[in-house]
């Protein structure tokens, strides 16, 4: 009887500790501040996490990354001195930190963009697996169609994907993704464009999986070819990552 009472008491202590955990909104901790581009190399590395190329016609190059007044500019420059399929030098950066949604937690990730949408332009703001693949969450992707895409991959064949019209691409637009623990295993992702919710998608078994945040300007590939014959730019500002774990 005493042993049974002890088990009940310990269970009650565990429940009390769980109940005392702060609400998720009170756990907010800024991991990448909105002015991080002013201290670029404190928070970001150049290129993709794995190197200079990825599924397109551009090779990433540090010289094609610049920051002015807190605005990141990635410039895709046509080149005829590269071996196929590379037809451009362009820019990419990725966060030095790895982000992992914990049980009961989440992340808010947001930024503002002036993104090209012409054929052959393929800028993206996305999360990719730190090890293996998936996870992958395309928080914002533009694939030369005049639309913006929101995507979550569970396998290469099982993909939640939504394309939306992207009006006035020469103006600034805001994008936000809210990642939350759904059930202890899966992550729920809500996507917002200019403050308006667009869709909700789910990443299976994403809890506990490390994610790398990437900002890049790829060309051709999935965005069509040939791409632009003169330099084009992808501009980004106010990237912010808030942990709710």
Q: What is each stretch, according to the model?
A:
Residues 146-148, 181-190, 198-200, 221-225:
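Substrate-binding/catalytic groove segments of enzymes
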Residues 119-127, 186-188:
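Beta-strand acidic-aromatic groove motif in beta-rich domains, primarily in extracellular
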Residues 153-174:
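Short, aromatic/His-centered strand-loop micro-motif at the edge of beta-sheets
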Residues 1-23:
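Fungal secretory targeting signals
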């Amino acid at each position: 009887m005493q042993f049974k009472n002890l088990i009940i008491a310990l269970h009650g202590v565990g429940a009390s500790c769980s109940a005392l955990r702060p609400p998720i909104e009170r756990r907010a901790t800024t991991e990448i501040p909105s002015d991080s581009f002013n201290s670029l190399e404190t928070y970001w590395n150049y290129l993709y996490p794995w190197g200079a190329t990825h599924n397109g016609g551009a090779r990433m190059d540090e010289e094609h990354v610049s920051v002015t007044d807190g605005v990141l500019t990635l410039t895709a420059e046509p080149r005829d001195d590269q071996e196929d399929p590379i037809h451009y030098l362009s820019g990419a950066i990725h966060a030095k930190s790895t982000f992992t949604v914990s049980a009961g937690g989440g992340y808010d990730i947001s930024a503002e963009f002036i993104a090209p949408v012409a054929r052959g332009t393929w800028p993206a703001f996305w999360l990719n697996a730190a090890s293996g693949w998936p996870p992958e969450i395309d928080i914002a992707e533009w694939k030369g169609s005049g639309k913006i895409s929101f995507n979550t991959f569970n396998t290469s064949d099982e993909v939640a994907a939504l394309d939306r019209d992207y009006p006035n691409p020469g103006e600034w637009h805001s994008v936000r993704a809210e990642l939350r623990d759904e059930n202890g295993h899966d992550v729920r992702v809500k996507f917002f464009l200019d403050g308006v919710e667009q869709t909700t998608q789910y990443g299976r078994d994403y809890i506990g999986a490390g994610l790398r945040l990437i900002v890049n300007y790829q060309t051709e590939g999935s965005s069509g070819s040939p791409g632009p014959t003169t330099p084009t730019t992808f501009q980004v500002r106010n990237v912010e990552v808030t942990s709710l774990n």
